[in-house]
Amino acid sequence: MENQPKLNSSKEVIAFLAERFPHCFSAEGEARPLKIGIFQDLVDRVAGEMSLSKTQLRSALRLYTSSWRYLYGVKPGATRVDLDGNPCGELDEQHVEHARKQLEEAKARVQAQRAEQQAKKREAAAAAGEKEDAPRRERKPRPTTPRRKEGAERKPRAQKPVEKAPKTVKAPREEQHTPVSDISALTVGQALKVKAGQNAMDATVLEITKDGVRVQLNSGMSLIVRAEHLVF
């Protein structure tokens, strides 16, 4: 008997589950909420198939249920399904709210990463001198003055007005920030700033978690930020 091919990544496992249970899993588009306890059903149904282990199934389920398209599908009125697509009860309000918060946090993280990447690109471009200097204006040839005839009186040269040196404009002093060294010293409601490249955005502490600090920006967006991106 030939050996079955082995699935090496969670994405490959999800593709296999979408083909094996098309009424439950989907490889693209909006996903349907899964039955609570579906992991054990998977272990019972696909044990040994494609050399899948429980660890692989658990990792694939975690990736599937944290994807944006799955979180979009967790909404009021949606129904959970089992492996065969049979309904297994409507979603409760607590699960819907949890999915909504996860989706907002994921979007905020992506937006912060994009802002940081754009700031780094601008810094790199400035350092490399990618901006081209304006082209120099061509000099016009100086007009030739007629030579003075012998015996003619020399006209006195007009004195040039003394030009005043232009006043130097002092560059605005760059705002200094103090990094946050200990997040346990922070308090809920405390004002601080979130660094994004060379910029620092005003924010307020909402919660201190094991992964970092949940803050709310002035725009109303909330996100979890690591300590190295926080300053006073």
UniProtKB/Swiss-Prot annotation:
Q: What is this protein called?
A: RNA chaperone ProQ
Q: Which InterPro entries would you find in this protein's record?
A: ProQ, ProQ/FinO, ProQ/FinO_sf, ProQ_C
The protein's location, in the record's own words, is: Cytoplasm
What keywords were assigned to this record? Answer: Chaperone, Cytoplasm, RNA-binding
Gene Ontology BP terms? post-transcriptional regulation of gene expression
Would you tell me the Gene Ontology cellular component terms? cytosol
Domain of life of the source: Bacteria
